[in-house]
Amino acid sequence: MRNTRALRTYGLFVALTLVVVSSPPAARTSAGTAEPAAPLAVLISCDGEVTVLRKGGVVKGAFGLPLEAGDEIRTGAQAQAEILFDNGNYVSLGAGSAMQVKGSKHEAASSTKPMGDNGFEVAQNFLKLKSPEGTSSIAALRSGRKEAELHALSPQRTRVLSTRPTFVWEFGSPEEELQITIYGENGILWRHTLVGVSQLTYPDAAPPLTPGATYSWTVETTDPLRVPPLRSNAAFFEVITVEEQSKLGVALEKIGDGAASAQSQHVMRASVFFAYNLLDDAVKETEQALALAPENTTLQSILARLYAESGRTDRAAETYGRILDKQ
């Protein structure tokens, strides 16, 4: 290994291991479905001329590229790469560097004990969103979707961290009065009328939301002359439990302790949120990662899938459409 910046083994995935061990409800593997073997490492950041020498030739380095034993990663004169190994170790390669992936478990020169496979699995599950599987349906939205005049955006098909979530919607007539309704297991929990806004944070004075419980919400017009009233889709969400929230806090803090690039930290945070089905939070982190690498089509594909999974089909179609336009 030459001109390689000092190997740093951070506590990035110590807490992630705890996350996965607790069997989060967002597990993505279907029963009876064989999963391909996980790679030994993955490129989580790739800037400039990065190449991977492997059996069969040379592969251009790219975000999310899986790495196997024998692969040699090389960076150009003004390039850098960040690699996450299956034992939780993290390596940053500076310009003009090279490193080879070795062994069934990469044994990096570090005094820190390996973290295990679970945290790596969290990141791998997130990166699987780049797969073209399912993108055909997103592409179909590009030409076949109908614009909803009143649409509940967030939270939708997701879990939330706070018992005071912020509800966000789209409406073509912002001057018209709306009514937002929150439903619990026993029916209507809270209602409120508003005008001229497209979001509302659940107030302290409203009936409290219970961690672990599932809720739904809608917005609709109140004008008696509009018959029938215009009503949004019903959006569902679940409040995460106190125990899970505590574990997540530790996981996110550990990621912040590392010296990974800002883009990589956003990707890692998004991976944790995705593992717990906190899709809105995963979307926000992926958006921030993409803002730092706007031409990263892999991140664009992941974001499109996250939009689709969280019910934001218009944004999914727009994002995927931009990918198709570049092809």
Feature map (PLM): residue ranges:
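Glycine- and acidic-residue-biased ligand/ion/polar-headgroup-sensing regions
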Residues: 32-57, 74-81, 86-89, 95-134
